C-alpha cells in the first residue's frame, strides 16, 4: 500500500462530507490525488466517500472531530499507516453562530464553541499532522478563512461584510493571526501555509443564503493546495489575489 500511495499526492480535507469541503476533496481527487475525507458524521462521511469514488476519485474516509484530541490523534495514525506522510492539509471544518450578532448580547457559549472549532481545532489538527507533513517533498497547509476576518476590510468605509458579528468574524481574525505565527515558525522549511477566502457561498453555514456555489467557493483553496515550491506563504487570498489582513 505504501509503495502505491507514495506515487500520489496525499491530502486531508477536514469537514469534507458536504459543501465547500466536499468540492475541495472532489477537485483534488480529480487531479489524481488520494484524498482523505475528514468528517465527524459517519453516515455523511461514508456517503461522500462513495460518491467521490463513483466519480473516479481515490477517496478514503477519516473519522475526524477537530474538537477532540483523541479523534485527531487517531486520524493522524490512520494517515500514517495508510500513506506514511501527508502532502496537503486543508483545514476546512468550521461552524458559525448567529448573524448579525452583537458582541454586547452574544452568548458566551457560542463564542467558546466557535473558537474551539474554528481556531483551536485548526491548531489541534495542524500540530497533529505536522510530523507527517514534514515527510512530504511539497507540503502545503490551507486554512479556510473569510473576508469577514480581515480587520482591514472590516474598518474600510463602504465595505459591506454583512453586519456585526460578535463571534464568527472574530474567530476568523484569530485564525488569520495564528496562520501568520505558523508561517513565521515554519519559515526556512518547505511548508507553505496560507488562508483562503471562499467568498459568500451558499452552504448550510449561512442557511444557503450565499451568492456563490460551493464549487466556486472551493476554487481558491484548490489553487493554494497545489502551489509550486516557490509559491507564497503566510498570506490570505481570494479568487482575485491577496486579501489584506
PLM segments and residue spans:
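Canonical Rossmann dinucleotide-binding motif of NAD(H)/NADP(H)-dependent dehydrogenases/reductases
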Residues: 4-36
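A glycine-rich helix->loop->beta "capping" turn
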Residues: 57-58, 78-91, 97-99, 107
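Catalytic loop of short-chain dehydrogenase/reductase
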Residues: 95-115, 134-187
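The beta1-alpha1 cofactor-binding region of Rossmann-like NAD(H)/NADP(H)-dependent oxidoreductases
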Residues: 42-43, 63-77, 108
Amino acid at each position: 500500500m505504501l509503495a502505491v500511495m507514495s506515487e500520489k499526492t496525499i491530502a486531508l480535507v477536514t469537514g469534507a462530507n458536504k459543501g465547500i469541503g466536499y468540492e475541495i476533496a472532489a477537485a483534488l481527487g480529480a487531479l489524481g490525488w488520494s484524498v482523505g475525507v475528514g468528517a465527524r458524521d459517519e453516515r455523511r462521511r461514508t456517503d461522500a466517500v462513495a460518491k467521490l469514488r463513483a466519480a473516479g476519485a481515490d477517496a478514503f474516509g477519516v473519522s475526524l472531530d477537530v474538537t477532540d484530541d483523541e479523534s485527531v490523534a487517531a486520524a493522524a495514525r490512520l494517515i500514517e499507516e495508510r500513506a506514511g506522510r501527508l502532502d496537503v492539509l486543508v483545514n476546512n471544518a468550521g461552524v458559525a453562530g448567529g448573524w448579525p450578532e452583537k458582541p454586547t448580547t452574544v452568548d458566551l457559549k457560542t463564542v467558546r464553541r466557535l473558537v474551539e472549532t474554528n481556531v483551536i481545532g485548526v491548531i489541534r489538527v495542524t500540530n497533529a499532522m505536522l510530523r507527517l507533513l514534514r515527510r512530504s517533498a511539497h507540503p502545503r497547509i490551507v486554512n479556510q478563512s473569510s473576508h469577514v476576518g480581515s480587520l482591514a476590510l472590516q474598518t474600510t468605509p463602504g465595505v459591506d461584510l454583512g453586519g456585526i458579528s460578535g463571534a464568527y468574524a472574530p474567530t476568523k481574525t484569530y485564525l488569520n493571526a495564528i496562520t501568520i505565527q505558523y508561517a513565521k515558525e515554519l519559515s526556512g522549511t518547505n511548508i507553505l501555509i496560507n488562508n483562503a477566502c471562499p467568498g459568500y457561498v451558499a452552504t448550510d453555514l449561512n442557511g444557503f443564503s450565499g451568492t456563490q456555489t460551493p464549487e466556486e467557493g472551493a476554487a481558491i483553496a484548490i489553487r493554494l493546495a497545489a502551489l509550486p515550491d516557490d509559491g507564497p506563504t503566510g498570506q490570505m487570498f481570494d479568487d482575485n489575489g491577496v486579501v489584506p489582513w
